[in-house]
Design a protein with these regions (language model features):
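Active-site and NAD+-binding cores of ADP-ribose-processing enzymes
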Residues: 1-45, 74-174
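Extended catalytic/binding region for NAD+/ADP-ribose chemistry, centered on the ART fold
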Residues: 47-72
Length: 174
C-alpha cells in the first residue's frame, strides 16, 4: 500500500523523523522496521516535542496533508514548516490490526478513538488510527515502510487536489 509521511530534511538532503528518534537519518529505497520509542516514567514516549502518547510504529497518512502539524498563525496551523517534505512510502501491509486496535477503544458502550491503538508495534502489518481530531483523512501506524521518493511541492498539490479535493498546505517561506 502507498501512504505518505512527512519528514524533516537537513541541509545535506537527509531525511529525519519529525518527532521520535528525530536525529536519525532515514534512507530512501530501503525497508525500515519501526523501533519502540524511549518511554518516560509516565508511560509516554520521548520526542522532540516532549512526551507523546505511546503508539509505536511508523505514522503515515493516506494523503500528503497534515493540517494539525506545522507553523501556527493566530493559534491555528497555517503553513508547513520550511524544513519539511512529504515522501511517498510503501507500507508493508500483510496483516491489518485495525479491529484489534479499535477493540482497545471500546469501554462499555462508549468508543474512545484516542484509545483505539496498540501498545506494541503491529508486527507484519499496520492499523488505521487517527492520531489527532484535527488530522485530515485516514492515518495509519505500521511496522515497516520503505521511502520510495521525496515529493515536490507541486506533486503534493496535485495529489491533494486530484485525489482528496483539498489544496496542499502552503510552505512557510523566510
Amino acid at each position: 500500500m502507498i501512504a505518505y509521511k512527512q519528514f524533516r530534511i537537513d541541509k545535506s538532503g537527509n531525511l529525519h523523523p519529525l518527532f521520535v528518534y528525530a536525529d536519525e537519518v532515514i534512507p530512501v529505497g530501503k525497508w525500515l522496521v519501526a523501533k519502540e520509542g524511549k518511554r518516560t516514567p509516565t508511560g509516554k514516549v520521548r520526542s522532540k516535542l516532549g512526551p507523546l502518547a505511546y503508539r509505536p510504529g511508523w505514522h503515515l497518512s493516506e494523503a500528503p496533508y497534515a493540517p494539525h502539524i506545522g507553523v501556527k498563525e493566530n493559534g491555528k496551523v497555517k503553513y508547513m514548516h520550511p524544513g519539511t517534505v512529504w515522501a511517498e512510502c510503501e507500507v508493508y501491509d500483510e496483516t491489518n490490526y485495525t479491529l484489534e486496535a479499535h477493540a482497545n477503544g471500546i469501554n462499555g458502550k462508549r468508543f474512545n478513538p484516542q484509545k483505539a491503538c496498540l501498545d506494541h508495534i503491529p508486527h507484519g502489518g499496520f492499523y488505521w488510527f487517527t492520531t489527532n481530531p484535527n488530522a485530515f483523512g485516514n492515518w495509519l501506524i505500521a511496522e515497516r515502510i520503505k521511502v520510495n521518493r521525496v515529493l515536490t511541492d507541486e506533486e503534493v498539490e496535485e495529489i491533494c487536489w486530484t485525489q482528496f479535493g483539498v489544496h496542499a498546505q502552503p510552505r512557510k517561506v523566510g
